[in-house]
Amino acid sequence: MAAKGWELKVTEFTDYVQPNEVVESGDMDANYFQHITYMESYNEEKGTHLVDAGDIHYEPLGVYPGKQTDLSAITDGAEIAVPNDTTNEARALLLLQEQGLITLNDGAGITATVNDIKENPHKIKFVELAAEQIPRSLPDFDFAVINGNYALEAGLNASTDALATETSDSDAVKKYVNVIAVKEGNENNEGIKALVEVLKSEEIKKFINDTYQGSVVPYEG
């Protein structure tokens, strides 16, 4: 940012409300912590006017091996652990559908639950657990779908350990990409455009890839 003539001041928050309040009030110019769906829901609930100034990264869910190691050879009746919260369960099911393991009802999309499974040829048993609990329970299941942040905390490498991960062009990623949020009308400010340009630069992409090893991925959409 300095090379572009801007001084960047960073303030850390420990909750998901204050960062939006200070941007809405104009006390701060932007925040970077939330995915676009959360921002839109926050606007709807709070009557705020936050907009997406730039799509920066996503944290892909991955399918990790437990008792079994080959998705293409999954046995009938296999148990797969999936997150039990609405958002991540839907993402998990969409990912498993992309791998050809199940078929969901038409239109299920990012609100899908296990009740939306239309075809389950391998008679997979889905066990719903709190997302943070799944990594330590991995040995108990044939496979598990794990969030990027919890995989990272558990020492799992999404690039080398996951059998499949969400990709940039998936519907789920488009809905859960982390963004630079600003107050409506400020998205074309020169400072904001400079910030987005820096965060989408090849240098920052390399930093993200080298640091997080696939658990956080630069968004290319």
What does each model-found stretch correspond to?
Residues 53-102, 205:
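A conserved helix-loop-strand patch within extracytoplasmic ligand-binding domains
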Residues 24-34, 78, 101, 122-125, ...:
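Alpha-to-beta junction loops
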Residues 60-71, 176-189:
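A bilobed periplasmic-binding-protein/Venus flytrap-type ligand-binding module shared by bacterial periplasmic
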Residues 10-21, 109-136:
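Short helix-initiation/N-cap motifs at beta->coil->alpha
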Residues 16-47, 153-155:
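Pocket-flanking alpha-helical
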Residues 41-53, 66-69, 140, 145, ...:
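Ligand-binding "clamshell"
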Residues 90-97, 199-219:
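Periplasmic-binding protein-like
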Residues 1-9:
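Short, polar/charged alpha-helical segment
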